[in-house]
Amino acid sequence: MALSIKVQSNIKIVQSKYIKFINKFPQIIKMGLDQAGENLKTIVVDRTHKRGLDMNNRKFIGYSPYYQELKGKTKVDLQDTNRMLQSIGSKLVSSTKAQVFFRSQREAIKAFRHQTGQGKLPVRKFFGFNKKVEKLIGKNYERFINKQIKKFKIWV
């Protein structure tokens, strides 16, 4: 008396999906980093323009009475011609790093003066992020990567 068993395996399907995933993974990482850079850019611009807050979520030092009267506004949002904040961009600089920067040298100098308080300007640190923002961007990055990995359905 003998027993026989026939085993069917899905190893070929899993193997092909795994190979596809390995080839696609560097691109997924780049997409995630690009998205993280864009997230940081959006956070900096929105926090500065819409809410009038610095990188530590504190209100900016107010405009001088003369400037308030001249421009007719009291909320500090670092908007005069709207060029400085519109000049902020993001790009991938390596396979592990995204960078948020000013596309225009002129606007970068203007931002540096606001950031450091050069000349008659008070210090208004808007171009940066705190630990809370860092954690938020990290979570968004992780969520994006996990979502992309799940699309491959490696384990059938």
Where are each of the predicted segments found?
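Short, Lys/Arg-rich flexible segments
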Residues: 1-156
